[in-house]
């Protein structure tokens, strides 16, 4: 009886408890930057130039989460530092870390899953570190700590967390 009720509830609410297993990381060419709750002021061109990447977590033709990465060889404490470091790393071809400077989700569970997929991507690309450039908000702090990151730097306007690879 309980199984029948659970199945009915899932169908009624269109809940797929295993959907994250079927989701995949895809590179995106375009996004609506106004949806970004962390850094909506960063335009699409900036997010894509100097080898920066935008990834989505795709499930059944829908993007469930988005993460933006830049690649550097040092930990930035501001968006300006991130800009300069990622430009230098592109020209010197010496980037050894991914900097996740924004991540957001459209469905419960998608934020955690996209970070897991970003870590897999970093391993495939032989990067040494995955570090965030996060705002000083309780939401950002809880998200990263809950997902296994460690706080490595507390700055005037940002904080950096590191995920282990």
Where on the chain are the PLM-derived regions?
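Conserved beta-strand-loop-alpha-helix junction that forms the acyl-donor binding cleft
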Residues: 131-142
